[in-house]
Amino acid sequence: MSIKKIINPEEFAKVWDELEIYFREENKTYGHRYLPISKQSVIDSWGHTALLNNTMHVWANLEDGKARGVIMFLEYMNTTFGEKMFTEYFWISNDSRKSFSLLKTALSFAKRKGIKYVTVSCVENYPTSERLKKVYQKMGFHKDTETFIKKL
């Protein structure tokens, strides 16, 4: 296993192609309410050199040259709080131990950049959501917001 920061748009698209195939069934069963994740929308929106180097920070867990996990964090100035934030955008992995290596890598990166605040989330429909919430709390995260969705 190796963790690699993804800064190249072609490599970013390859990671998403590999993960979409790898997690297709899981995404259908445990994904977000109403809305499946759109691989192409993510690639089109974030797969640009300037964004991957400055705003959307992406790390992939590579095994035998193929992506088996990815974590993405958005770095931005939160205008409500007047603070730079590091917000989890997407996180998926086939191995919880390797998955947390991705998270630790991202958090270390944010700390080195001097970012003071990090937000993380979890999908309610996922079987391990309650366990993940407890892990977040053990890591020092505090519950701040709940999000609700309704189809109109």
Give the ranges of each region predicted by the language model.
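A short beta-loop-alpha structural element at the N-terminal edge
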Residues: 1-21
